[in-house]
Amino acid sequence: MRALDYLPPVDVTFGDFLRAVITAETDHDPVDEEGIRRAWMEAFRLRGILPDDAPSFSEEALCWPTLGDALPIGKLPYGGPLGLSYEEREQTHQILREFIDQNRAFLRLAPVGEDVGEYQIPSFHPLVRVNRAGSIRWELAVEIVQTGKGRPNRGTSFLMRGGTTLIVSTHSTAGGAVEDRMFPRFVIAKPLDGPPGEARAELQRAHLEELGYMPDGDPARYRINFALLHGGD
């Protein structure tokens, strides 16, 4: 369950899930004496499921990269046992908006234009992390989503979604909490633009064409004739 917070907000792949699991387990238990992370990796490797964007197939490479503490966000409300109140959510939303607006490139958000809409924040929620040694860390998981038009090399445009999962922590990479200063610890992106966005657009176009949803596809090709069920022997 911890791994779900380490997934990109859109177009999740099995490779993304493996990276999320390895990252979550490394956060929870850096030593991993039982070999849980190695078992996950071996199970995925045997099934030929490998992440496309990892530098190599090692624990260090599969973990999402952590960020330094040079880009503080400011003070965010922690909330109580029942989460954030309405006022705290409004305050958090405003602080996040200001941070995102000032750091769009850092968060790998595409520039707004004719084919790309403005970003939205569909959800954010506080997390209290307790690792195996009993250390506690407060974090905030934020989903940022953009909608744009995919324009592959051939065919017409179609809607695509991109975005970033931002995990904000009270701990810097040095491991110490700093009062009133919180930092982006992970930026897990599925951008709309650049080579990754273009590759996803081509894959999505091919999928839609196969389903017959593109102008050069044939929807009837995949239509099932249920009348044939009554024509058996």
Residue ranges of predicted features:
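Non-catalytic terminal regions of proteins
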Residues: 1-6, 16-18, 22-233
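Flexible, glycine/charged-enriched surface loops at secondary-structure junctions
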Residues: 11-15
